[in-house]
Amino acid sequence: MSGTILITGATSGFGQATAQRFVKEGWKVIGTGRRAERLEALSAELGSAFHGVAFDITDEEATKKALAGLPDGFRDIDILVNNAGLALGTAPAPQVPLKDWQTMVDTNITGLLNVTHHLLPTLIERKGIVINLSSVAAHYPYLGGNVYGGTKAFLRQFSLGLRSDLHGKGVRVTSIEPGMCETEFTLVRTGGNQEASDNLYKGVNPITADDIANTIHWVASQPKHININSLELMPVNQSFAGFQVYRES
């Protein structure tokens, strides 16, 4: 199986690894992101099978313009991977700047909706696949996860609702929900604190970007009569935390 796939957030982590995997498998890949220089480097690495488009998915007009301007040979999109997303900060809710919450909502939710809404007609026409990158944070709350977890819960529910709305049209929708993954994600979350990022994953043997790329490829490779509704995965060394209990004195 091969075709054309669009991956948001292709400048690093899951998105970059997924672009590399799908080009290797013979697909045409459209990679989006805000860092044009990284898209140019990826294009130099992957060749003519990769087309990079630099724009901000939170900007509705920029999204429309960028996607409407895709060149011939890259317009018939079979798979949309909504990967772009971020978490900012690890502090409890009362200590988080409102701007950080707004940025997470804008990127993780609004940006995803902008891209998905624009591409739905093509995906319906081609009986395509929508793959949304959610998180185990959609299910399991943790300290400092407040708005980030809320945005990922939205992605999971949106995936289920979209699948319901598109029932009978042959479009498949999947929510992939990873646990601890070692990418730039934590470096961004900690404001560039490399030591804090390294310590988080020390001794964990976390999920890698290649693991997620392989998972996305597996989902996309299923027979057309099978829909993977959701797929939750964790490293073996990660499990479930106990409930917090506050004891009054």
From Swiss-Prot:
InterPro entries in the cross-refs: NAD(P)-bd_dom_sf (IPR036291), Sc_DH/Rdtase_CS (IPR020904), SDR_fam (IPR002347)
PROSITE patterns: ADH_SHORT
Entry binding sites for substrate: S135
Reaction(s) this enzyme catalyzes, per UniProt: L-serine + NADP(+) = aminoacetaldehyde + CO2 + NADPH
Keywords attached to this entry: NADP, Oxidoreductase
The protein's Enzyme Commission number: 1.1.1.276
Residues given in the record as NADP(+) binding sites: 6-30
GO molecular function: serine 3-dehydrogenase activity
Gene3D superfamilies documented for this protein: NAD(P)-binding Rossmann-like Domain
Activity response to pH changes: Optimum pH is 9.1.
Active site: Y148 (proton acceptor)
Lineage: superkingdom: Bacteria
CDD domains assigned: SDR_c5 (cd05346)
Record-stated family: Belongs to the short-chain dehydrogenases/reductases (SDR) family.
PANTHER family linked to this entry: ALCOHOL DEHYDROGENASE
Function field: Catalyzes the oxidation of the hydroxyl group of serine to form 2-aminomalonate semialdehyde which is spontaneously converted into 2-aminoacetaldehyde and CO(2). Also acts on D-serine, L-glycerate, D-glycerate and 2-methyl-DL-serine. Does not act on O-methyl-DL-serine and L-threonine.
Assembly information from the UniProt record: Homotetramer.
Protein name, per record: Serine 3-dehydrogenase
Species per Swiss-Prot/TrEMBL record: Rhizobium radiobacter
Organism lineage: Bacteria, Pseudomonadati, Pseudomonadota, Alphaproteobacteria, Hyphomicrobiales
